[in-house]
Amino acid sequence: MSARLHAALQFAVSAHAGQDRDGEVAPPYACHPIEVMLNLRYTGDVDDEDLLIVGLLHDTLEETPTTPVGIESAFGPRVGALVQELTRHEPTAAEVAGVKKDEIWKLRSGMLLAEIEKMSADAQVVKLADRLSNVREARIAKSAAKFARYLGQTQSLLEVIARKRNPGLWDAVKAEVAR
């Protein structure tokens, strides 16, 4: 592992310190970005160090007080831009005022898929590695109904991201959906 990748690993672990993932047996949050990076490297055969670093940092802007400037100054403009590109945008309070939970989920899902469709090829590759990690965890952590809904969203994601982006990751996500 290069010094730069090691620094990104330490950055991610530190940024997510004290956070846990969802579920009854919630692992430390840092396990997720590490899995995303490993998915990129070993399932996706990605050896682009910037993308591996983005895999480690992809949730830092939305889940921690980390700033875009902090990421860019530590890891460069390409990493900073990709992490920003992967950061979800949430509906405004006005958009969800008086809206039922299921309808909010549909709104957020539609927003996410629209964002993914506009992402760069590199960001879409990281998104596939992220979704692979998330769908595996969701199988264990979500109720049957929520997991079924999540699988539907994942199938839509596979329709938005072309298989040619990264056949190894795309096929792995598809296999999880079919499982």
What function would you assign to each model-found segment?
Residues 1-179:
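Active-site helical microenvironments for divalent-metal-assisted chemistry
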